Curated annotation (Swiss-Prot):
Mg(2+) 2 binds at E319, N321. This is D-alanine--D-alanine ligase. The lineage of its organism: Bacteria, Bacillati, Bacillota, Bacilli, Bacillales. Belongs to the D-alanine--D-alanine ligase family. The gene is ddl. Binds 2 magnesium or manganese ions per subunit.
Length: 370
């Protein structure tokens, strides 16, 4: 019997469009001889819309953007099938057929542990990281504390709350200028894909960057800028994760001052070198830190570890991403392709890992014996 694969994408997030691109790529790579694929679109307003079972490849991303006027018949939790109704998340519940959810969601409400909690409540297997790893890795401040506890080197950083910024802005700026030197990068604590991130080279730009970042979150992290190579590594597995070859990001000339949202998803000016050259001892250290971060977060399925490597071979772990860009041309799938695991096989491996983790969880005891 085929595995029913529910593809969940879209979402009430600034990264809605990224999720659509990811879903389009995964759907077109699926082996429909092995999977019964069902798309579920989450609109910008948070409405869940069930699409038809897939019978072939899609031609355009827009085919995944279901609306009130072109919706298929939808199964609601309370009623018979009816035209034009949004579904309840209860549609995710398994119906006797082996079912796995593949959440192709980015950003808040997608890779921050919230939707993962829903899957846990429904006791349904799902691809990727669980509640703990997803929520911790989505929060740059919490993530940094976990890395520090594991002894993983990071660039200096200062965390700032909105309430403190409003009440003590001048004192906050003074503290940052004492701890850090320009340039610095200002980031919302709880957002991905470089959304809301700015580079500041002086006090005026710092204040402007803080104002921008606080539009997206009430907590902000300010990081020391470093002149370094940006090297990324894929991690795959559950309890015994393995690492891919390393890849390097090379933004073209002055196209982007840093690897920003547009460079990641919209431009064709960002060069990826896979595999990239790294000294053997640095490569081994990189693998060690990537696995330490994976295990420290209690991650599962997939993680992309992003490093900085300076000219004098100082290695810093910048962040990990628990749902990295996942089109065939994104860094994570390309890393595994060059390691020997093509895109379609990578998807199937992730589904297998989801089943494996779910079986292990269900084998645990949840009550004392009488």
């Amino acid at each position: 019997m085929k595995t029913k694969l529910i593809l969940l994408y879209g979402g009430k997030s600034a990264e809605h469009e990224v999720s659509l691109q990811t879903a389009f790529s995964v759907i077109n790579a699926l082996d429909l001889e092995k999977f019964e694929a069902e798309p579920i679109y989450i609109t910008n307003e948070g409405e869940w819309v069930q699409g038809p079972l897939l019978s072939g490849k899609l031609d355009f991303v827009e085919q995944l953007r279901f609306s009130a006027t072109d919706r298929v018949k939808l199964a609601t939790a309370e009623s018979e099938k009816s035209e034009g109704e949004a579904i309840s998340p209860a549609v995710l519940e398994a119906d006797g057929q082996e079912t796995v959810v593949f959440p192709l969601l980015h950003g808040p409400n997608g890779e921050d542990g919230t939707v993962q909690g829903l899957f846990e409540v429904l006791n349904i297997p799902y691809v990727g990281n669980g509640v703990l790893a997803s929520s911790a890795a989505m929060d740059k401040i919490v993530m940094k504390k976990i890395f520090a506890d594991a002894g993983i080197p990071q660039v200096p950083a200062v965390a700032v709350r909105l309430i403190d910024w409003k009440n003590y802005q001048e004192e906050m700026v003074t503290e940052m200028e004492e701890v850090l030197t320009y340039p610095v990068f200002v980031k919302p604590a709880n957002l991905g894909s470089s959304v809301g991130i700015s580079k500041a080279t002086n006090k005026t730009e710092l204040i402007e960057a803080m104002t921008e970042a606080f539009l997206y979150d009430r907590r902000v992290v300010v990081e020391q800028g470093v002149v370094a190579r940006e090297i990324e590594m894929g991690v795959l597995g559950n309890d015994t994760p393995v690492c891919s070859v390393p890849g390097e990001i090379l933004p073209e000339g002055a196209v982007a001052k840093f690897y920003d949202y547009k460079a990641k998803y919209q431009d064709n000016n960002t060069a990826l070198i896979i595999p990239t050259e790294v000294e053997p001892e640095i490569l081994e250290q990189m693998k060690e830190y990537a696995v330490q971060a994976f295990l420290g977060l209690d991650a599962s399925g997939l993680v992309r570890a992003d490093f900085f490597l300076t000219e004098d071979n100082q290695l810093f772990l910048n962040e990990v991403n628990t749902m990295p860009g996942f089109t065939p041309y994104s860094m994570y799938p390309l890393l595994w392709q060059e390691t020997g695991l093509p895109y379609g096989a990578l998807i199937e491996r992730l589904v297998d890992l989801a089943k494996e983790r779910h079986a292990a969880k269900n084998a645990l005891k949840y009550k004392l014996e009488d």
